[in-house]
């Protein structure tokens, strides 16, 4: 009896519970559906990006980026400088032991070792050449000139002196690059010692012109730098070729050839006009010295269009210590003095 009564009670309670209408079920279903993308209207609503639209735009941007990258690579691949630098990246560097071993083979005349030593140091040339960019020569020309200095260094390097080759080669590389800038950046070729003399005159004349109301005269310049007026007039005869000194040589026009010349105010330059016969005599006198003494004299006193070198710089160039260069210089000058005496030539005659 109790069981039947309980069932009847449950049925009555169930009937009292209201079932949701079909209309309410539909409304609930509509609310649970995902919202559709908002459409743009004339009132400036933002477009809702669908997944498909976003993917298409990203693909287009990626394709555009790839095209630009490909174009840059093609440009780099056709650039001679980039090609050369990329090739250098594959050249192995030498450690101290390898360098010493190969340098000894070069000293004995091994052509394969010579090639290996050159190729291993081409990057050193590029590194040094970068310091001379925008000074009148293209970058590849600077590298080419530096490579000539590297060849000279390889030929002259003595591995038994205790120097690293890079230290020795740097001097020769810089020397050839600087000489090329002086020689090739001019419309008229002049010897290095003449350019230096001309440099002193130009700087002095420019300074005087700024201080006085008229253009500096040879007498003004001669008085200021303590030189004979006649010598200054000889410099003025070079005026047609000297005018190119102030021509801008950098791309931005901020640097002229005169800016690339060293300031030699503290150096007593060689005479501008040297007698041809005297030059011949000097060559003959130098030829009577041995190779090492002759090389030290040439580098120390700036002969053969070289710059005057300090004892330390010459020592690096020939692979000797500073003191040893000084000793060789003294000995070489004594030999030259003896040669002059044997020919009856005095120091005063040479100076005149």
Curated annotation (Swiss-Prot):
Main localization (coarse): cytoplasm
Swiss-Prot/TrEMBL keywords: Cytoplasm, DNA-binding, Sigma factor, Transcription, Transcription regulation
InterPro entries hit by this protein: RNA_pol_sigma-70_dom, RNA_pol_sigma70, RNA_pol_sigma70_r1_2, RNA_pol_sigma70_r2, RNA_pol_sigma70_r3, RNA_pol_sigma70_r4, RNA_pol_sigma_r2, RNA_pol_sigma_r3/r4-like
Region (Disordered): 1-78
Region named Sigma-70 factor domain-4: 285-338
GO process terms (BP): DNA-templated transcription initiation
Residue span of region Sigma-70 factor domain-1: 79-112
PROSITE patterns linked: SIGMA70_1
GO MF: DNA binding; sigma factor activity
Location of the motif Interaction with polymerase core subunit RpoC: 141-144
Cellular compartments annotated: Cytoplasm
Membrane-spanning ranges: none
Region of interest called Sigma-70 factor domain-3, as start-end residue ranges on this chain: 197-272
Regions annotated as coiled coil: none
Region (Sigma-70 factor domain-2), start-end ranges: 117-187
Pfam families: Sigma70_r1_2 (PF00140), Sigma70_r2 (PF04542), Sigma70_r3 (PF04539), Sigma70_r4 (PF04545)
Residue ranges of the annotated DNA-binding region, renumbered to this chain: 311-330
Bias-annotated ranges (Basic residues): 1-38
One GO cellular component term: cytoplasm
Similarity comment: family membership: Belongs to the sigma-70 factor family. RpoS subfamily.
Subunit relationships: Interacts with the RNA polymerase core enzyme.
Name of protein: RNA polymerase sigma factor RpoS
Source organism: Coxiella burnetii (strain RSA 493 / Nine Mile phase I)
């Amino acid at each position: 009896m109790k069981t039947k009564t309980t069932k009847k009670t449950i049925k009555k309670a169930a009937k009292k519970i209201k079932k949701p209408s079909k209309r309410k079920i539909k409304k609930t279903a509509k609310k649970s559906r995902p919202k559709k993308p908002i459409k743009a209207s004339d009132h400036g609503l933002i477009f809702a990006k669908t997944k498909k639209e976003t993917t298409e735009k990203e693909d287009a941007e990626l394709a555009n980026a790839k095209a630009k990258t490909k174009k840059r690579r093609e440009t780099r691949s056709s650039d001679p400088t980039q090609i050369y630098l990329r090739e250098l990246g594959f050249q192995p560097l030498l450690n101290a032991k390898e360098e010493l071993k190969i340098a000894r083979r070069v000293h004995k005349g091994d052509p394969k070792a010579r090639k290996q030593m050159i190729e291993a140091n081409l990057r050193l040339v590029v590194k040094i050449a970068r310091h001379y960019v925008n000074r009148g020569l293209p970058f590849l020309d600077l590298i080419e000139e530096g490579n000539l200095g590297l060849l000279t260094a390889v030929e002259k390097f003595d591995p038994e002196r205790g120097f690293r080759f890079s230290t020795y080669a740097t001097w020769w590389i810089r020397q050839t690059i600087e000489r090329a800038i002086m020689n090739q950046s001019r419309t008229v070729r002049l010897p290095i010692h003449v350019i230096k003399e001309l440099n002193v005159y130009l700087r002095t004349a420019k300074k005087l012109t700024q201080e006085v109301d008229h253009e500096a005269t040879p007498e003004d310049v001669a008085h200021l730098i303590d030189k004979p007026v006649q010598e200054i007039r000889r410099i003025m005869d070079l005026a047609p070729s000297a005018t190119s000194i102030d021509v801008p040589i950098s791309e931005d026009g901020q640097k002229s050839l005169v800016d690339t010349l060293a300031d030699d105010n503290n150096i007593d330059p060689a005479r501008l006009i040297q007698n041809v016969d005297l030059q011949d005599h000097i060559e003959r006198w130098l030829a009577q010295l041995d190779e090492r003494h002759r090389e030290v004299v040439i580098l120390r006193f700036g002969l053969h269009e070289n710059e005057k070198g300090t004892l330390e710089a010459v020592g690096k160039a020939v692979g000797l210590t500073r003191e040893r260069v000084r000793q060789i210089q003294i000995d070489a000058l004594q030999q030259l003095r003896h040669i002059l005496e044997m020919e009856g030539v005095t120091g005063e005659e040479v100076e005149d």
